[in-house]
Amino acid sequence: MNLEIKHAILVLWIFLQVQGIKDTSTKTHSSGTKNIDKAPRIETTESTSAVHKASTMKRLFAVAKLRNKRSALFPAVNICPRESLRQILESLQEYYRLRVCQEIVWEAYRIFLDRVPDTEEYQDWVSLCQKETFCLFDIGKNFSNSQEHLDLLQQRIFQRSFSGRKDDMSPIEILGVPTTAPVLPIDVSSMSLRPFPLPPDDTDLKEVTIKDIQTPIAIRRAELESKPEPTHVTEISSEEKVEFSISLPNHRFKAELTNSRSPYYQELVGQSQLQLQKIFKKLPGFGEIRVLGFRPKKEEDGSSSTEIQLMAIFKRDHAESKGPESDLLSLDSNKIERERIHHGAIEDKQPEAYLTAADLKKLIIRLLDGDQPLVGGTVPFSDEVTEPLFRPVTQSELPKPLTDVTEDVTLSPELPFSEPRLESVDIYGPYLPDSSWSRPVTASTSGVGNLPSFTPSIFALDDQSSPPLMATGPTAFIPTLTLPISDYSTVRQWPLEVSHWPESSSDRELSTTSSHDTIRDLDEMDVSDTPALSEIAELSGYDSAPDRFLEMTTPIPTLQYVTXSSETIAAKGHELVVFFSLRVANMPFSYDLFNKSSLEYQALEQRFTDLLVPYLRSNLTGFKQLEILSFRNGSVIVNSKVRFAKAVPYNLTQAVRGVLEDLRSTAAQELNLEIESYSLDIEPADQADPCKFLDCGKFAQCIKNELTEEAECRCRQGHESHGTLEYQELNLCPPGKTCEASQGQATPCRPPDHSTNQARQPSVKKLQRQQNKVVKKRNSELSATDFEELDDQDWEGN
């Protein structure tokens, strides 16, 4: 009972408290209303600006309530509530690196390359930046040193007009018209017509020194001074001509240089054009370079030198052709002339290019040293000149007329096309005595017949009196042919690998320097002149038994080259030899190219010789000979061999590859020859197998001499040659002939195109007498189909 009373009292008390609070709030509201009514009214003259300001703030706060708030601490980063503080910080740092790297890479492409990057390359650079592979500023250095950036700068220097500098110059500086002769001397100390060295990056600015230039030079495209002042706009030309001169301080001026027909003049012109074309072709629009003449020059020390006057012609498209037809920019490498500006109707329309001393210096340095290194590596040529820069041409080196042919012969056919066999190569030693043949001598020209003009496939830079490069140990020589070629030719001398055979039209006796007064003609030779097979079996790489061969793989070459980045040295007593092959994709192959005596082979051989020899000679120090070994099918594959000195001041393989890559681009532009880059196969002799570049056919096998490292073709079992005495004991098939299948007995080697090119085959009297009528009839009736079927049967039987 008491508990219920207490509970009722508590409820009543709570009710009274709540009721009292309501009464108090009502009184307060009433008093506030009364006070407001008693207060004075706000005057209408008060400024309305405060009211407008308050309303604006209210609107801003209202709009802010509708906007999504951005986190001030974690922008664009999703924070998981379960992450720790350390994980949150790592996420922020990773996002920071991503955004910074994206901006850096994007700006690098925009500033240095002026283009939008591809997606893959952009992601690659961002990934490298995030992994801290490159420092932030190293990325900019990498882009600024890239070849694409340097090419872009080079194009802008030649194509962009620096018109913004015109207002900063005085009229005298812009016009560049002094009171005396308008010449500013510039000393280019290292400019010469030897192969230009590619110096290291830290020394390239020392190559060219520019003096006496204090103000910017405005080089203007003006008209030729020989033409009168123009009064109207002439036709727009597609060419722009640049005249300049080069000083040769160590080359004295000679009287022969005043006669443009003299051999010395022609040689110097050719060397100058070859050197400068390689450098100027890097400039956009370069067309050709012409030698205008030579003149003497006196140096500061009183010595005499030669100055070459040249003209470079650049081709322009119609968008860039804004100057008159006779636009000529006179740029002298030792003298930069400020040309007179013709005042006329076209003065305001001529584009101008203002170059400061720094711009001009960089331009000349880049022109001399070259921006792009050779593909496959830079060729580090030596700065020292061990020989005279230009050697006067002697009478013996001048091209000879066609009547100076020393022997009336033709070339034998080439071996048939077949893939080279590398798996089985035999090695043999010297196998012919010294008395077999004598060295070739010059015979009378009275019996010379009409021969097609062609050039042999070996060219050398040495004097004709020097010993033959291929003569090592006891060798045999065949009378050869001396033909009119350029100044780098010598008499062609072959050891065993002979491609020239005497004609059978008449018997000839040749005078020799040996103990014999005369040499017996081929028809008077006997088998006793040749050593028996048993006498040389110990030195040869195959068994003397006639029923089988000693097959062996190619051993490790004993010839080893010392190759470094700056030099290549051959073994003692040897020369540096490089084999290379290249493929011309847009040239159809003809089976006449298997026959070295065919006119098509000779013409193509001459074409590639004229193309390759000048490049190799002018760019590779120590170059001696180029020998075109053969042409193979596959469009046209050219197999060649190059001989050098015993030591050269550069990496031989990289240098040859670089020159051939450079030749490939030149041939594609000027000669329309598509030489495929991936087809270039370059191997030094100490690493290469010479049989790889020699085709012997299905019935022959390649063998290699241990001493001379030369490759030969030898008939396989059942296809031995019995028709030529000099090869019958050794089972060797002469170059240009193939081993022929036979039934029951071996038959002589025959040219690969016996049925179609019989008129051009070399014939020897001895072969004609030894071949009886039965053999001739069998050979003539042997068709191509029977030949192939019998070929396969014999091959399977072996």
Curated annotation (Swiss-Prot):
Native organism taxonomy: Eukaryota, Metazoa, Chordata, Craniata, Vertebrata
Classification via InterPro entries: IMPG (IPR039861), SEA_dom (IPR000082), SEA_dom_sf (IPR036364)
Major location (coarse): other
PANTHER family given in the database record: INTERPHOTORECEPTOR MATRIX PROTEOGLYCAN (PTHR12199), INTERPHOTORECEPTOR MATRIX PROTEOGLYCAN 1 (PTHR12199:SF3)
Localization (cell): Cell projection, Cilium, Photoreceptor outer segment; Secreted, Extracellular space, Extracellular matrix, Interphotoreceptor matrix; Photoreceptor inner segment
Gene Ontology MF annotations: chondroitin sulfate binding; heparin binding; hyaluronic acid binding
Pfam families cross-referenced by the UniProt entry: SEA (PF01390)
Residues annotated as domain SEA: 238-360, 574-687
Keywords: Cell projection, Extracellular matrix, Glycoprotein, Heparin-binding, Hyaluronic acid, Receptor, Repeat, Secreted, Sialic acid, Signal
Reported modifications of this chain: Highly glycosylated (N- and O-linked carbohydrates and sialic acid).
Entry protein name: Interphotoreceptor matrix proteoglycan 1
A Gene Ontology cellular-component term: interphotoreceptor matrix
Example GO BP: visual perception
Region Disordered, residue ranges: 741-798
Cleavable signal peptide: 1-20
Motif (Heparin- and hyaluronan-binding): 624-632
Presence of keyword Repeat: yes
Biased composition range(s): Acidic residues: 786-798
Glycosylated residues in this chain: 142, 442, 445, 595, 619, 633, 651
Function, in words: Chondroitin sulfate-, heparin- and hyaluronan-binding protein. May serve to form a basic macromolecular scaffold comprising the insoluble interphotoreceptor matrix.
